[in-house]
Amino acid sequence: MIDPDGFRPNVGIILTNDAGQVLWARRINQDAWQFPQGGINPDETPEDALYRELNEEVGLEREDVQILACTRGWLRYRLPQRLVRTHSQPLCIGQKQKWFLLRLISNEQRVRMDLTGKPEFDGWRWVSYWYPLGQVVTFKREVYRRALKELAPRLLVRD
């Protein structure tokens, strides 16, 4: 599903532990790291997509996490021209994302990247909250900065 402007609806997942660190995942067979993310199907809400992607990419269930916050609006990034599939219709030029800040409330041993037939990640680690800004691919950096900045105050609030 691609909107009229060419952006694919998507959710981004910032999973935190009790130390305030975030889960940083390595793309399979690459030296590229990112937060888990994935598309929103036509019949899904962003929250539905969050839980589906969380299970597919990280192996966690709804009961393993607590939602702390979600970005107010959509955050957009454009794909570099070399990644745009110019022969696909409708043309997708980027992603528009709702970002969720989650707290892991179960044991971290529940994190599994290999539960699907086509895993997206082959490794993960806990990193400091702002660490991803200096590590993510350049074209996603501004969206990461905006999401982390907007959601940071909720990390400090313990319900």
From Swiss-Prot:
The keyword Transcription does not apply. The keyword Hydrolase applies. Its EC number is 3.6.1.-. A motif (Nudix box) lies at residues 38-59. One of its GO terms (cellular component) is cytoplasm. Signal peptide: none annotated. PROSITE patterns: NUDIX, NUDIX_BOX. Transmembrane segments: none annotated. InterPro entries: Nudix_hydrolase, NUDIX_hydrolase-like_dom_sf, NUDIX_hydrolase_CS, NUDIX_hydrolase_dom, RppH. It comes from the Bacteria. GO terms for biological process: mRNA catabolic process. One of its GO terms (molecular function) is mRNA 5'-diphosphatase activity. Accelerates the degradation of transcripts by removing pyrophosphate from the 5'-end of triphosphorylated RNA, leading to a more labile monophosphorylated state that can stimulate subsequent ribonuclease cleavage. This is RNA pyrophosphohydrolase. It comes from Pseudomonas fluorescens (strain ATCC BAA-477 / NRRL B-23932 / Pf-5).
